[in-house]
A protein has these predicted regions:
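Solenoid-like repeat scaffolds
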Residues: 1-7, 34-44, 71-80, 94, ...
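"A position-specific structural signal for the A-helix of alpha-solenoid helical repeats
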Residues: 8-18, 45, 51-52, 84, ...
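Residue-level signature for tetratricopeptide repeat
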Residues: 19, 56, 93, 127, ...
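Structural motif corresponding to the intra-repeat A-B loop/turn of tetratricopeptide repeats
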Residues: 23, 60, 97, 131, ...
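Alpha-helical solenoid repeat scaffolds, predominantly canonical TPR units
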Residues: 32, 69, 103, 140-141, ...
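Eukaryotic tandem repeat interaction scaffolds
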Residues: 80-148
Length: 210
């Protein structure tokens, strides 16, 4: 049965892709995901797999390919959360030569996105950081923190991003240490990077005191 065969192929490839993704092996995961998508047919999960392809391409700097997959997600008219994240992906993978702040602003004004303002401001900050506009990036990250509400991962991610900028760009160790401390206080202890960030904050604070 060809249909069953295609379903089995898709499941095999997508399961392998998931395992590689868990190991942070983005290239391997992407190859398997793209192959798996050829066999998936009209599955309700197709939009989600397109979205993951978009994310992986964006993380590897393949913005043109990322945009293709984000558009595929939006074409399928998914539920709100998936559409929101695909729209953000489209904007964050936009060419740095283009001014995306107007489009981000439209997303901020959309009442449907009221609970996701922290995420939007974080994407705006990431875009400014890619342009090396670090002061603007810090400003948007602070807006992200102020608007994150109970979304601890977003809030912690923005604290960490500010800390990284102060440490790596401005070499302001005291400010970096303060923001790493805020990251640790905010970040859920079951997050995979909690121990690594705790050690980084501890080492930096010891360096400042020495």
């Amino acid at each position: 049965n060809r249909k069953l065969n295609n379903t089995s192929k898709a499941e095999y490839l997508l399961t392998r892709a998931y395992l590689h993704q868990k190991l942070n092996e983005s290239n391997e995961a992407l190859i398997l995901l793209e192959e798996g998508l050829k066999y998936i047919g009209k599955s309700p999960n197709k939009a989600r797999y397109n979205f993951v392809c978009g994310q992986l391409h964006e993380s590897l700097g393949n913005n043109l390919a990322a945009r293709k997959y984000y558009r595929n997600v939006l074409k399928s008219k998914p539920e709100y959360e998936m559409a929101f994240n695909a729209q953000l992906g489209l904007l964050s993978s936009e060419s740095l030569a283009n001014n995306t702040n107007i489009l981000f602003g439209e997303m901020l004004e959309d009442r449907k996105n009221l609970d996701n303002k922290g995420t939007i401001y974080q994407k705006m900050a990431q875009t400014e950081a890619r342009k090396k506009n670090y002061k603007e990036a810090i400003s948007f990250y602070n807006q992200s923190i102020a608007n994150a509400g109970d979304n601890a991962p977003i809030k912690a991610g923005s604290y960490q991003a500010i800390a990284d900028i102060y440490l790596d760009v401005f070499q302001d160790y005291e400010k970096a240490g303060s923001y790493y401390d805020s990251t640790i206080v905010t970040l859920p202890k079951n997050e995979s990077n909690f121990d690594k960030l705790s050690l980084k904050a501890l080492n930096l604070n010891e360096f400042i005191r020495s």
